[in-house]
A protein has these predicted regions:
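Glycine-rich phosphate-binding loops of nucleotide-dependent enzymes
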Residues: 1-168
């Protein structure tokens, strides 16, 4: 997050990787520059609307509540038009309601943007609620792989995360 920039500028920066104008075009503000800037502004506003951030478009990003900052980070990532979206502990610091909203948002993103999502997360409710396939690590080593249902009943996973006494 670029905390000192506005919400819309945070998203526009990500779209800038797709512009074709050069520095000279930007300095003289020629037609190519102006039309591309208008285009990325409109695209950024569309993403902000999707993530319910359009009313905060001109607010400084650091002034947003934590949950909205997370949504802004995801919107900015989607502006790069990825094929794979990496979400590293997106629920960290969120309250249960924000986590529930995040779960719904991740499901919607996967469907609407037709992309793969790599989720690294400790909130098992979120993991079980959005993942089709789960890889479980213990001390950096893979100990299990499978569907949420398979992982939920995997004795090795239960032992590693809840303790051996839970199994016995």
């Amino acid at each position: 997050l670029f905390s000192e920039l506005s919400v819309i500028d945070n998203v526009k920066i990500a779209y800038n990787m797709h512009v074709t104008y050069n520095l000279a075009d930007a300095i003289v503000r020629d037609g190519k520059y102006l039309s591309e800037e208008e285009y990325i502004t409109q695209k950024a506003l569309e993403l902000l609307k999707i993530f319910h951030l359009e009313e905060e478009a001109h607010e400084v990003a650091k002034n947003l509540p934590y949950g909205k900052q997370r949504r802004l980070e995801i919107a900015r990532a989607l502006a790069t038009e990825p094929k794979l979206l990496l979400l590293d502990e997106p629920a960290a610091g969120m309250n249960p309601q924000e986590t529930k909203e995040l779960m719904e948002m991740i499901r919607w993103i996967r469907k609407e943007f037709n992309l793969s999502i790599l989720l690294i997360e400790h909130d098992m409710g979120l993991v079980m609620g959005v993942c089709e396939r789960i890889y479980v690590l213990e001390y950096g080593m893979k100990i299990a792989e499978g569907t949420p249902e398979e992982i939920k009943h995997n004795t090795r996973v239960i032992e590693a995360y809840l303790g051996e006494e839970v199994i016995n």
